[in-house]
A protein has these predicted regions:
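Conserved, helical-rich catalytic subdomain that frames metal- and/or nucleotide-binding sites
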Residues: 6, 20, 94-96, 100-191, ...
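Phosphate-handling active-site elements
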Residues: 31-40, 66-87, 207-218
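Conserved glycine-rich beta-strand-loop-beta hairpin in the small C-terminal domain of fold type I
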Residues: 198-201
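Glycine-rich, flexible beta-strand/loop modules in the N-terminal catalytic cores of phosphate-handling
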Residues: 1-29
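Short, contiguous, well-ordered secondary-structure segments
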Residues: 20-42, 181-183
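DPxDG-like acidic metal-binding loop motif
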Residues: 51-77, 93
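Short pre-catalytic strand/loop immediately N-terminal to key active-site residues, enriched for Gly-Thr
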Residues: 39-52, 192
């Protein structure tokens, strides 16, 4: 084949645009003559589209990491940042699976051995368009993470922060408000927050047992919603 082939399978593989983060990555690599072969890429899509969890960005990041690890392409730090930024602002976060802060000046700081939290991730049947949610932003908040510190991963700090896009999404989609209210009263989570521009809502728990019990109860009461438990890195 004269073109790269990107195949998606899995529960959330339907209706993925042919112009996506992975095709964007390959277009960039070919334009810069960093690759000269054609590839068949198979991706199992386990993360829902339009959930605000950056699944597409992480797909591209992991393929780029693989190419670097296998010496298929040789890149310096500046080139990696350039490629990541071209694909999407959060792609750079996926280049190293650890706790990271991306500052407003596009600098990244990574931290090891942060406290692990257990998460219950819930998504209704509808998704949120990032472009649409951002179009309702009237005023941007002052940057809070220009001076990253490890304490920003402490529970007390995280509990006091907020997602500036949450108010917009919850106003547009009242169902999200109901989910958040339900989760806040489900087995005493540390805090509950919307992901990115939505539509997934995450409840954070101190123990796996609390999280598992909460998941069981949520699934019992909301059979039509996607719900999965996980943990922070």
């Amino acid at each position: 084949s004269r073109n790269n082939r990107i195949l998606f399978n899995g529960k959330f593989s339907k209706n993925i645009n042919s112009k996506n983060t992975v095709s964007k990555l390959f277009n960039f690599l070919e334009r810069k003559k960093l690759i000269n072969q054609k590839y068949l890429i198979k991706i199992t899509k386990n993360i829902p589209q339009k959930s605000g969890m950056g699944g597409g960005s992480m797909n591209a990041a992991n393929i780029l990491k693989y190419f670097i690890k296998k010496n298929i392409i040789k890149l310096n730090t500046k080139q990696i940042s350039e490629i990541a930024e071209y694909i999407g602002s959060d792609v750079i976060l996926g280049m190293d699976s650890t706790n990271s802060i991306l500052t407003s000046k596009k600098k990244i700081k990574r931290y090891r051995k942060c406290k692990r939290l257990f998460t219950l991730i819930v998504k209704p049947k509808f998704g949120c368009s990032t472009r649409e949610i951002y179009s309702h932003v009237k005023k941007f908040d002052k940057a809070k993470f220009y001076n990253p510190q490890k304490k920003m991963f402490d529970i007390d700090f995280l509990r006091k922060t907020n997602n500036s896009l949450e108010k917009i999404a919850l106003k547009k989609y009242p169902a999200l408000s109901k989910i958040k209210f339900y989760l806040k009263n489900l087995k005493e989570p540390i805090f509950v927050r919307m992901t990115g521009s939505g539509s997934a809502i995450i409840a954070y728990y101190a123990t796996k047992r609390q999280c598992d019990i909460a998941q069981k109860q949520f699934n019992k009461d909301h059979k039509k919603y996607w719900c999965i438990s996980s943990k922070t890195i």
